[in-house]
Amino acid sequence: MPAFWLAVWLFRSGRWPNKSGADTLVNKLIRDFALNEKEKQQLFDMTIPKGIEGVLFQQNPCSDEEILDLLPPAPDSKPQRGGALRQLELEAIGPTKSLTFNPADRLTIVTGDNGLGKTFLLECAWWSLTGNWAGRPATPRLDADKTEPKIKFQITGKGLASQRKTTIQYNWEKQAWPLLKGRPTIPGLIVYARVDGSFAVWDPLRYTFPQSQLLRPEAALVFSREEVLDGRPEHIEGLIRDWTKWQHSPDQTVFEKFKNVIQRLSPPEEAPLMPSASVRIPGDPREIPTIRHIYGDVPFINESAGIRRIVTLAYLIVWAWTEHLVSAALAKIAPERKIVVLIDEMEAHLHPKWQRDILPAILDVAALLDPLVDAQIIITTHSPLVLASVETRFDSESDSLYHLNLTKNGEVSFVEIPFLRLGSVDDWLTSDIFELKQARSREGEQAVERAKQILAEEAPSKEELMEITGRLQMSLPPEDIFWTRWAYFLERKGIRL
């Protein structure tokens, strides 16, 4: 046991003379506990870390969390399980020079323009949780100093150990991020839906060594769109085979969960998506599952991109949970109750009616797996309909909204912003998140903005009034609410439409 660090923890709140040093702490430990030479030799490591003197004593005492960041973990300590992402700090990587992200317990929504780092943030979140990159590893910014690039994260479970933060410094010589060997908290089950149609899955029970805490290379499985459909040997059977297997199994438990999840994620105002009888199609020896529509059954491989993405998400969530239960049963331990779901561009391929319903449905999926499952959901979106959809579900105690924005000086900012109920989707479009001046076409927006400028002028010319009226007629429909204001203004100037 390191005597120095034990003394730091035990005496962290004490007051010390100005000339105190590291040996002062260790000597106090020896005196207070009356340690003899034999006890010191057999029970303690009496060495003092190098470079500690300059930061050991300060005016204000450190918090327990700050001290835990410094303390090395006990060599025989076992990691806590069932963690979720509590904090992610990025320095000198990605579009922002520095970024601090504190995901909420239940739902976190990330918005922002293209190219500002939403996908990059999810990739770093996945890496922090699993220790593996789902795609290309993040690289330092071109303007980064040698000591700058680092990723700092905190995965929380229960207890003090889960409050520890982990810092990974970029290795310039190896051009890589060092692998983390062991961590105080292991995350729960994770499913990551990437925007290119691929998926990544992490299961701590299947892919960790409980004794050594070393993460196996296959700890995080990343499946291409084709592998999710057709399988990968020794890892996943694939949607086609698993769906058919579940559907024809004497035990319908898994298939019922799958059907329930699909139905909850179905597009609104239509008949729920329902699995139908599998069929054979030319050139394929397999039984292909189908989905029942009002107009008939459709083989899954012929479905629309939107239906394929949502049904595939449902499949991966159910598959990951089912495999987790199998692994827990084989290991004779209780299954995890924490699931982390990452979804990039939640609205991809979905009709506006479906965009307005999909996120509330995602919030309900965990309970369909098991009423005791607790989910942390982190999504990115460009859609005002997705934000409007959770106005009645958003809880500031358990949910958060973050926004990436390009500032006037050309830097990317990342801030948490209050979630406001704006009601109309038009109001969301013209909010600070989406930054449209008008919820119209670009030509209509420009015409209305110019008309507003003329409204503020004292004596606009008749030619200007007729010119802008023509632009408004070209870009606005007759029932547009702006016409009432403009017609009244023209009448005051002696012009009738």
Region locations from a protein language model:
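Acidic, Mg2+-coordinating catalytic modules of nucleic-acid enzymes
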Residues: 1-69, 102-107, 131, 184, ...
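Short, ordered beta-strand-loop transition motifs
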Residues: 143-147, 279-285, 407-409
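Conserved P-loop NTP-binding catalytic core
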Residues: 123-178
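Coupling/switch segment of ABC-type P-loop NTPase heads
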Residues: 169-269, 425-433, 437-452
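A general structural signal for short secondary-structure junctions and capping/turn motifs
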Residues: 142-145, 179-188, 251, 281, ...
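Long, charged, glycine-rich C-terminal linkers/tails
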Residues: 270-290
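Long, acidic, intrinsically disordered low-complexity segments
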Residues: 66-68, 72-73, 149-151, 246-274, ...
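Switch/communication elements of ASCE P-loop NTPase nucleotide-binding domains
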Residues: 24, 31-34, 50-133, 286-428, ...
